[in-house]
């Protein structure tokens, strides 16, 4: 029988498994593909294929991530699973794998553990909009009262981190039973996918967000004016629309008088396009790489913020020594480096290479266009020593 082709007609959603080590994230990922393969919605992917995840580089950081894809009757999913705890932290902080929703896997035998908490916190900070819980390994728990207790603990934890704990679906099952083809195991996987289909909202497409383009290059065309080039990050820009140039200096307003792509004139540029935008009345020296072109009022420049950061270990090419308060590296946002000073929390004397999920405050020497959820790298002497996400703007 010919293999059914994935239809791209269904809405696409990016999802990932999160949770404590050994609670069954990878087994669950394998179980989902195995159960959905029976109805032609996936290619069954074995545990060891997912566990041997290839390494990828994202903003100078090596991350192991496994990608599988599958579909339900309503949606097409791209699913990420990371073998190691540090890979999760790096993945979520760098945004290497953007998640529209997550499946939190908790072992019914152990209940929520340290990494369960860390992953929920990170999901909140990087803006994962919704999650569904899979209470795994229920086949090894005989006492229904214990299951209830674990469920209550999970809801308490979700509540602490600002998720709507009493709305979040919690599905009980066993990934191993599903992999073994047992009916109760498969039933739980189908229930889980129904919950994911119905509870995790449709993602807002990049083209529906306000227009934003990081400026990569600026040049002047004699007789026509100044052109800025870059890849449109979100939204749509049409000829004749007003835009703002934000970051590094005073924000200025200007008008887009032309959009070009591959030397052809367009009426508009949209998310994902590499374009040149002609700006009315703007001088070449008034714009520079590192600023952004944006819909007026949609993004502001800031120079003080709080961040959640992953600091590379020595083995990953990071620093060999810890850093302390007032450390001054470069912060790389989108297309440019800006020097900034790090202020550590009062209870922290230093940050060691390899520390994951570290929180501190940053003060930049120049303001950069940013918002909560903006990603950055920390660089020193041209090499990446960390990656972070803005969790709160302070000014």
UniProtKB/Swiss-Prot annotation:
InterPro entries tied to this protein: EF-Tu_GTP-bd, EF-Tu_GTPase, EFTu-like_2, EFTU_2, G_TR_CS, P-loop_NTPase, Small_GTP-bd, T_Tr_GTP-bd_dom
Entries under Gene3D superfamilies matching the protein: P-loop containing nucleotide triphosphate hydrolases (3.40.50.300), Translation factors (2.40.30.10)
Molecular function as annotated in GO: GTP binding; GTPase activity; guanosine tetraphosphate binding; translation elongation factor activity
Signal peptide range: none
Swiss-Prot/TrEMBL catalytic activity: GTP + H2O = GDP + phosphate + H(+)
Residues the entry annotates as binding GTP: 19-26, 81-85, 136-139
A GO CC annotation given for this chain: cytoplasm
Alphabetical list of CDD domains matching this protein: EF_Tu, EFTU_II, EFTU_III
Protein residues bound to Mg(2+): 26
Domain tr-type G: 10-204
Pfam families, sorted: GTP_EFTU, GTP_EFTU_D2, GTP_EFTU_D3
Spans annotated as G5: 174-176
Region (G4): 136-139
Region called G3, residue ranges: 81-84
Assembly and interaction partners: Monomer.
Functional note: GTP hydrolase that promotes the GTP-dependent binding of aminoacyl-tRNA to the A-site of ribosomes during protein biosynthesis.
Record protein name field: Elongation factor Tu
Gene that encodes the chain: tuf
